[in-house]
Amino acid sequence: MAVKTYNAGVKEYRETYWDPNYTPADTDLLAVFKITPQPGVPREEAAAAVAAESSTGTWTTVWTDLLTDLDYYKGRAYRIEDVPGQDEQFYAFIAYPIDLFEEGSVVNVFTSLVGNVFGFKAVRGLRLEDVRFPLAYVMTCGGPPHGIQVERDIMNKYGRPLLGCTIKPKLGLSAKNYGRAVYECLRGGLDFTKDDENVNSQPFMRWRQRFDFVMEAIEKAEAETGERKGHYLNVTAPTPEEMYKRAEYAKEIGAPIIMHDFITGGFCANTGLANWCRNNGMLLHIHRAMHAVMDRNPNHGIHFRVFTKMLRLSGGDHLHTGTVVGKLEGDRQATLGWIDLLRERSIKEDRSRGIFFDQEWGAMPGVFAVASGGIHVWHMPALLSIFGDDAVFQFGGGTLGHPWGNAAGAAANRVALEACVEARNEGRQLEKEGKEILTEAAKSSPELKAAMETWKEIKFEFDTVDKLDVAHR
């Protein structure tokens, strides 16, 4: 056995953390970063610096390295690839031994991968593009409280996407008027209504009063329609104790689903709430408020596909994913990629959709993809074509903005959805025949006809800021 010796001083990171001959183990956590190095910093040195700072390294040699098996615990930069069309950037692939991370802790994984390293002077820009979680680590995480199939069984809804609506205006309504809007939307044909991300417990509408009026609306709509209904009661709160207090009250009054803002609320709170929901039979809707602060810049931050994986591990039955066709950012191919990462059990590397690694989820349940943001009845054919059945389509303004009121807006969306599902089941091409399908359905639905007339000119044709880098080995 070789004798370890300590030589004080500073040495280049690549001497220890660059290992192009390394073959990743099945149990390694793999990450790919898009790096923009400072001028004059070699690619291998920049990649090794990221591997060091996100694992065992520091800026100088330390004698305590001799007290551990550094060769086992260190992260290894093992491959570098060009970013298509970007001479100053490259992809760095890094392997981390699984023992660097606390079991079942998304918090700990994020603290390592995107902690101090993002302020490193050796790089001008750093973006975490994708992560491969080994199955051995996936199995230590709780994941979604219930998942897609259990939710369908709870809500008794099969063979189609679910329909929702975010109540607007998002702020300022009294609890009673808020409950009235919920009732009208649910009675009109929606499956769910929703608190917006910043509806918590403000002076104009305290949380307990909102919960009570909303539950009254749900029970009334269920009695009149014979369908199971729900409303995402946002339990995000200033403290974990207050969050659980609100969750317990939602359970007490019979609500089927609650909601959490998982980024602003934090992964620690989210994982705890997901565990509580699993133990108490409550569904959990997840909003991604604040995500674009970190994922929209193509040169620095965290890609949203990483957030989808982190959320699936931390726990949630629904996650907002963008719409492709609405008002929010979302490249079509990249969106299709992270939808699969949320819902499927096994996903293969597919650079055309931005997926850098194979990902196995084992028996972990899937998550409903939620399409929300600037959508209306004209988008229904494209939404069904893009998302398929295991999704929630949430029309906020596209319901409440109907010229005849909330119930009519809900009815228009329900008719449009059922017409598109029937057409798809008959083998028709939704995105090519969408106008014809909706026009035919509107002949027997004045609510749909009015909605189509109202929003016939509304489009959101802005170019995507975060374009997909199509890279091949």
From Swiss-Prot:
Active site feature: 168, 287
UniProt signal peptide: none
Binding residues annotated for Mg(2+), in chain numbering: 194, 196-197
Entry keyword set: Calvin cycle, Carbon dioxide fixation, Lyase, Magnesium, Metal-binding, Monooxygenase, Oxidoreductase
Protein name, as recorded: Ribulose bisphosphate carboxylase large chain
Residues at which substrate binds: 116, 166, 170, 288, 320, 372
Induction record: Expressed under both copper-replete and copper-limited growth conditions.
Gene that specifies this protein: cbbL
InterPro entries, alphabetized: RuBisCO, RuBisCo_large_chain_AS, RuBisCO_lsu_C, RuBisCO_lsu_C_sf, RuBisCO_lsu_fd_N, RuBisCO_lsu_N_sf, RuBisCO_lsuI
Presence of keyword ATP-binding: no
Subunit details: Heterohexadecamer of 8 large chains and 8 small chains.
Assigned EC number: 4.1.1.39
Protein's organism: Methylococcus capsulatus (strain ATCC 33009 / NCIMB 11132 / Bath)
Matches recorded under PANTHER family: RIBULOSE BISPHOSPHATE CARBOXYLASE, RIBULOSE BISPHOSPHATE CARBOXYLASE LARGE CHAIN
Catalytic reaction(s) noted: 2 (2R)-3-phosphoglycerate + 2 H(+) = D-ribulose 1,5-bisphosphate + CO2 + H2O; D-ribulose 1,5-bisphosphate + O2 = 2-phosphoglycolate + (2R)-3-phosphoglycerate + 2 H(+)
Site (Transition state stabilizer): 327
Job of this protein: RuBisCO catalyzes two reactions: the carboxylation of D-ribulose 1,5-bisphosphate, the primary event in carbon dioxide fixation, as well as the oxidative fragmentation of the pentose substrate. Both reactions occur simultaneously and in competition at the same active site.
UniProt cofactor(s): Mg(2+)
GO biological process, one term: reductive pentose-phosphate cycle
Protein family membership: Belongs to the RuBisCO large chain family. Type I subfamily.
GO MF, any single term: monooxygenase activity
PROSITE patterns, alphabetized: RUBISCO_LARGE (PS00157)
Modified residues (N6-carboxylysine): 194
Record text on cofactor binding: Binds 1 Mg(2+) ion per subunit.
Top EC class, one word: lyase
Leftover remarks: The basic functional RuBisCO is composed of a large chain homodimer in a 'head-to-tail' conformation. In form I RuBisCO this homodimer is arranged in a barrel-like tetramer with the small subunits forming a tetrameric 'cap' on each end of the 'barrel'.
